[in-house]
């Protein structure tokens, strides 16, 4: 009986996540269009030199598969959107990632950015803003993998 109780508590304790469990943002995320609310593309987040970056892996709209960023500036101007790094230099700060920027390939605008993982790492709430975070908009991306 005592052996069964010990076994029960071991199984019970091992089923709870550790306090230090912190899901990684790395992986493929499905973006959702702000207007249609339909899946729009896939963005792969990856770590490089201690920061998180995001690259567009695919467009889910066949009409946008060969789209170029005509409104972008600098080295992104007139480059294919698929394959483009749109999120740069995001660093972990407490429970969020911040300090980097995100590009809107439709407008060519670059915004300051922050994001948090929610729902056990299955959702990524991305906020792009100018100046202060209150002056911006958020999107929720869904983990693909």
Question: What positions do the PLM features span?
Answer:
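Bacterial N-terminal signal peptides that target proteins for export
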Residues: 1-8
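Bacterial N-terminal signal peptides
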Residues: 8-16
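N-terminal helix-cap/turn-to-beta initiation motif at the start of protein domains
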Residues: 18-28
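Central antiparallel beta-sheet cores of small beta-barrel/beta-sandwich binding domains
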Residues: 31-113
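Short aromatic-glycine motifs in intrinsically disordered, low-complexity regions
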Residues: 72-78, 125-132
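Short, compact, well-ordered microdomains
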Residues: 112-114, 122-125
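Edge beta-strand at a domain terminus
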Residues: 121-123, 129-145
